[in-house]
């Protein structure tokens, strides 16, 4: 059984890669890795069991987590911008509200005389129109309901495509400066300054036209996660500096799969899977459970056999962290970035009619432990029949 939780930060949260903060490194606080959420929830579970010395740490690794997910003030989920969405600005548009145009990239075919080194059977991802301008920077997270509506043919809200629509935690970062303390003398070490940058999920301060404070915004952001064990509501720690978050249960509505989407996926010839969290594969971008023909059974869903036909990838991400059990850094690994989209043709379907719900927020990663840690969580999206017919005609 899966339990859904909302995590409400009480202070800016610090997540980092291990590099020093500062303008020289350009390595500020970032959205947390799945392992950070999994570790926090497993620690909370052990404490709920009365294990304050982490004697059940190995047992806790068998508990599955999914997340993190960004929860917006509208009480809905936000997901990373999908890699198959190309946003362009029409400089000649008379109506500035319609200057930004979103184009859907799809599996297709090369033009005559063109080719590539793509693996046999993998189609290129193409843009229906020939863009003459550069892609635009947009918000890094989009509302899930708006994304799914766009998949079904509805227009995407133009205001949400602007970079100013970036969720508040990424715009309102808190930077604090600290000094290193000499443990022997109890005084600061001269010249030893360092900074900590955190993501601020709290209500931002409003500033009026004169530059004075005008109260606080009503927007409150949070994180969401799923866990395979029940947890007590209360304060837990998450990320660096032991920052606190309030763990709240009873938020199942946030993670429910829309019934219309489940029905569409159940009868579709194929499905597009977009990563909500980075994915870890043994063969780089290619899932290890696929054979040389790019076919394989989806991990954890017996009877669901798929064939990969195309993928739209963001730049790979370097993943590392701290191993609490071994007290040493974890080996660095390359991950497929969140937002990347894979198109699969459905070859065989499970006999269980509820299989689309099992696909919702499931993990696509290769290793069992990586899936338990929440790496490679996906949302299924509606794909057009033409996305697959062009690639299956030979």
What are these language model-derived features?
Residues 1-394:
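Conserved active-site/ligand-binding neighborhood in enzyme cores
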């Amino acid at each position: 059984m899966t339990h859904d939780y909302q995590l409400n930060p009480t202070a800016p949260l610090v997540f980092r890669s291990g590099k020093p903060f500062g303008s020289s490194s350009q390595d500020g606080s970032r959205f947390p890795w799945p392992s950070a959420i999994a570790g926090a929830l497993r620690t909370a579970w052990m404490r709920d069991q009365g294990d304050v010395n982490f004697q059940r740490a190995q047992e806790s690794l068998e508990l599955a987590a999914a997340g993190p997910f960004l929860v917006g003030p509208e009480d809905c989920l936000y997901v990373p911008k999908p890699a198959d969405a190309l946003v362009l600005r029409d400089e000649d548009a008379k109506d500035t509200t319609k200057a930004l145009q979103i184009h859907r990239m799809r599996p297709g075919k090369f033009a005559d005389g063109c080719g590539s080194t793509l693996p046999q059977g993998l189609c290129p991802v193409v843009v229906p129109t020939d863009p003459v301008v550069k892609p635009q920077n947009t918000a890094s997270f989009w509302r899930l309901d708006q994304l799914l509506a766009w998949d079904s043919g509805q227009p995407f809200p133009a205001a949400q495509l602007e970079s100013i629509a970036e969720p508040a935690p990424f715009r309102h970062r808190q930077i604090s400066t600290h000094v290193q303390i000499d443990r022997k003398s109890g005084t600061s070490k001269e010249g030893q300054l360092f900074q900590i940058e955190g993501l601020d999920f709290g209500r931002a301060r409003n500033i009026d036209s004169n530059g004075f404070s005008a109260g606080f915004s009503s927007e409150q952001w949070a994180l969401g996660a799923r866990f395979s064990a029940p947890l007590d509501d209360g304060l837990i720690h998450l990320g660096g500096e032991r920052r606190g978050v309030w763990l709240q249960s009873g938020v199942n509505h946030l993670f429910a799969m829309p019934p219309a989407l489940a029905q569409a996926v159940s009868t579709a010839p194929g499905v597009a899977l977009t990563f909500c969290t980075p994915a870890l594969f043994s063969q780089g971008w290619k899932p290890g459970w696929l054979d040389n023909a790019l076919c394989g059974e989806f991990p954890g869903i017996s009877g669901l056999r798929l064939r990969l036909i195309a993928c739209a990838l963001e730049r790979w991400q370097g993943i590392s962290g701290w191993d609490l059990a071994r007290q040493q850094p974890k080996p660095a690994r390359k991950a497929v970035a969140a937002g990347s989209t894979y198109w699969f043709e459905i070859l065989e379907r499970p006999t269980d009619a509820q299989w689309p719900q099992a696909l919702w927020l499931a993990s696509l990663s290769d290793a069992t432990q990586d899936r338990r840690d929440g790496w490679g969580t996906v949302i299924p999206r509606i794909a057009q029949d033409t996305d697959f017919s062009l690639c299956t005609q030979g």
